[in-house]
Amino acid sequence: MCGIFGAVSSKDVQKDLIDGLSKLEYRGYDSAGLSLFSKSRKIKRIRCTGKVKELKKLAAITKLSGTCGIAHTRWATHGVPNLKNSHPHNFGKFSVVHNGIIENSDELKKTLINKHHKFSSDTDSEVVAHLLEHFSKKHKNLNDVLLNTFKKINGSFALAILYENEPDKIIVASNGSPLLIGIAKNANYISSDIQALANKTKEYISLEDNEFALIDKGSIELFDVRGSKISRPPLFTKQNIKKVSKNGYKHFMQKEIFEQKDIIMRVIKDRLGAEKILPNIFGPKSDVMLKSIKHVHFVACGTSYNASLVAKYWIEEVSDIMCTAEIASEYRYRTINVPKDTLFVAISQSGETADTIYSIKKAKQSNYRSVLSICNVPESTITRLSDYSYLMHAGPEISVASTKAFTSQLIALLLLATSLSRSSDSKLENKIIKQIKTLPMILTKTFELEKNMQVMAKQFKNKNHTLFLGRGASYPIALEAALKLKEISYIHAEGYAAGELKHGPLALVDKDMPVVGLMPDNNLVNQVLSNLAEVKARQGLVYIFTNKKMKLKKNDKTNIIPMPACGHYIAPLVYVIPMQLLSYYVAINKKTNIDQPRNLAKSVTVE
């Protein structure tokens, strides 16, 4: 993991390779490298730790050029981030880049070492280059070499390969990890991400599981796992990728936080009528499908999972539909019981999250009524696998820590909950639509808390632990607040249902522990106040975000952050904003890498 790009052309492709990698940088990575065929028809390789700009400098120094090459940005899974573990991995006449995990790499490595192979890295990926070289000694036919290699590999992979006996070809293969082939005039491209292809060509083929292809500048040969040729019509992307800038903001995360109001305004314009949701916003004939749903099953990871937990509260409150939410990495390995007329909903910003993709494939083999995806990237793997799709149109989210995608998911899920409620309460739809339409004005007021968050962040700078508490739909917002703080400031943070405080977390509370309570003015206010009183009794530092008017004693050290009044259903979208700002400014004070925090990747394409 994390990004693959390749090009074969009648012209020099070195700059194309660097440009392709630069468009994959947003996914997160710790090293980069490329291989190409030189004029002598031999494979030449350069690698570096750090950023693509360092690889670009290295390419200029070495004057590397060629018409056929592959490139990779790596996010470490097997082996520490260093030069020897960077891709491409070369052995014999082969050069390989790999996304995914070779699950039986240790076993394969032992077998190959016994055959006198010497390994130069700690990665699972290098095994592929050795297997290819091993089978090339036994088979003259390239397809036989490839098929025997693929049979030995257990796990997920997207592979791009150069072979010195075929110096005008890129070899690609896929199983459980996305890989696309872009088709152009006198050139063909490969990428793990449509965003790196969209400025090169609009025509592409998506490599399916257990397929491989041989690509030169003028042709693409596609094969199945048996080595039989297959034919598939190309797809066409409508994406026009523009260079994304910070527009004067210090970080992409800051920019993306402040874009949320405009995104919601677009939803109001494009998805809502005067009093009702526009027809079929979840795909053609989706309104008919939703009328038959009796259960909803959400599957997602990370921030998207937190969004699904909010949706569970909404759906069960506004309809008679039972709802469950599961972490994708757990769902894909367990035995499931699917009630009749259950809607499976997958949520992913990138549309390429490995565990979520595998969960959809599992769902497609189960007894679900339909599969719906909520995603930000058109033509992603998740949208292609789904029966219905809701595209968030939030624009590229570059920062690893998700902000605008989270609120876009919440809006989509609130619209889903409302659509499911139509049969039980016709007036409720109008009420929720009215609340959504107040959001732009309320968020304008919420962003005025930025200075408060700057002050509060200084108080958090030297803390080691933080608790976030909430009840009802505010509980998942507490989870999301904790996730944001730990992601970018590296402060240990936990989100809890406030009622669970005395069942364990209270043992952690002392005078150095900030405890943040999220308390919209609703029927749970008194319960949250009771929980926070327990914190104050242990000298904990209490911060309450609320729109309820509260009177405090002069000696009370509780910090009240006044929130703008808002409707019940939109409260999660309002209360998450100061949590994002708080995390951002704590990270500013700690001088961390905000847009690309350590050890994290934007698009998690391995399990």
List where the protein language model places each region:
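Glycine-rich phosphate-binding loops that contact phosphosugars or nucleotide phosphates
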Residues: 291-438, 471, 518-564, 582, ...
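Generic C-terminus detector
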Residues: 227, 541, 554-556, 566-607
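Conserved short alpha-helical segments that host acidic/polar catalytic motifs at enzyme active sites
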Residues: 1-246, 250, 262-269, 273-294, ...
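Glycine-rich oxoanion-binding loops at beta->alpha junctions
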Residues: 67-84, 274-287, 311-347, 353, ...
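Active-site phosphate/pyrophosphate-binding segments
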Residues: 260-264, 268-297, 388-514, 590-607
